[in-house]
Amino acid sequence: MGCRQSSEEKEAARRSRRIDRHLRSESQRQRREIKLLLLGTSNSGKSTIVKQMKIIHSGGFNLDACKEYKPLIIYNAIDSLTRIIRALAALKIDFHNPDRAYDAVQLFALTGPAESKGEITPELLGVMRRLWADPGAQACFGRSSEYHLEDNAAYYLNDLERIAAPDYIPTVEDILRSRDMTTGIVENKFTFKELTFKMVDVGGQRSERKKWIHCFEGVTAIIFCVELSGYDLKLYEDNQTSRMAESLRLFDSICNNNWFINTSLILFLNKKDLLAEKIRRIPLSVCFPEYKGQNTYEEAAVYIQRQFEDLNRNKETKEIYSHFTCATDTSNIQFVFDAVTDVIIQNNLKYIGLC
C-alpha cells in the first residue's frame, strides 16, 4: 500500500511539474503576444491599416491575391459613378450635354451584369467615360459632401481604361484604395520585433459595435482611427449625425472606459492627405463653429487633435499617443507603426513590472 502511494505521489509531482512548465511557457508566450484592437467609426481607414500590415509584415499580396480584388475594384468604380449620377437630380444639376441622359439610362442597364461578372465591357466603358467627363457630373462630384461617395471615386474613375482592360490585374495601390464594408471580426497575425501581433479589426458601423465587447479581453493596445477629412460629412446610418461628432463620442467612451485603464491608447488621425486638400475649399467651422483659426492643414489638424485629446479625463495616469497618418501611404504607416510598437513594448513592460 505504501509503495503504491509513493508511486502515485511521484506521478502527481511529475504532473505538477509539467503543469508548471506549461504555465511558465504560456505566460512567456502571452508576454510576447501583442493584441491590437482597431476601433473607430466607419470609413476611418481601419481595414486599410490591416492591409498595410499584410504588405509590411506578412509578405504582401501575391498575384492570386491581387486578382481576387478585381471584382471589388470594378464594383467600387461602377458604384461611385452611379452614386454621382443619382445625386444629379437631388442637387438639381443638369448634364452639360443632353445626350448624357441616354448614357445614364444605359449605365443602370449595364451595371448589373458587369458587377456580377466582375468586368467592364467596352460598351459600358464608353458610357462611363462619357458620363464622368461631362461637366455636369464633375460639378456633382465637386459637391460630394452633400451625399455619400467613397474617397476612392476619382482614383478609379480617372483610370477607367486601365481598370476595364481584359487583362487588368489590380496593383497594390488599387487594393489599398478599395473599399469593402467590414462586418464581423477580422483578425490578422504577424511577427515584428520578435513579438507576435494579433490585430483585430471590427466593423465601425453602429450595428457592428455590439460585437466589440467580444474583442476586449486581453487587449494590449487600442488603435483608434479618426477620419480627419470627415468633418463636413454625415453618417451613412442616419444621414444627419456628423461623422466627426460621432467619432468624438465614440472615442470618449473608449478612452474613459474602466476596462482599458491599463491599455495603451494610440490615436491615428487618418486621411491627412484628404484633409489638406479639403480644408482649402470647406472651412473647419462647418463642424466646429467655435473654430477661429486659419483654414490651413496645420492649424485644422492640430485643432482636431486637441478635441480628441481633451476628452481624456485621466491625463495624470493615461497618455494618448497621437499620430497623423495616411493609411494608403505604406512608408508613412511603416514609420508610424514602428514608433507605436516601441511605445506598446515599453508600456507592456511597465505594466508587468519589468520596467
Swiss-Prot record:
Main localization (coarse): membrane
Lipidation feature positions (N-myristoyl glycine): G2
Residues bound to Mg(2+): S47, T182
Residues the entry annotates as binding GTP: 40-47, 176-182, 201-205, 270-273, 327
Organism domain of life: Eukaryota
Domain G-alpha: residue ranges: 32-355
Region (G3 motif): 197-206
One example of a Gene Ontology biological process annotation: negative regulation of insulin secretion
Region feature G2 motif, mapped onto this chain: 174-182
Function per UniProt: Guanine nucleotide-binding proteins (G proteins) are involved as modulators or transducers in various transmembrane signaling systems.
Similarity section: Belongs to the G-alpha family. G(i/o/t/z) subfamily.
Quaternary organization: G-proteins are composed of 3 units; alpha, beta and gamma. The alpha chain contains the guanine nucleotide binding site. Interacts with ADGRB2.
Protein name, UniProt field: Guanine nucleotide-binding protein G(z) subunit alpha
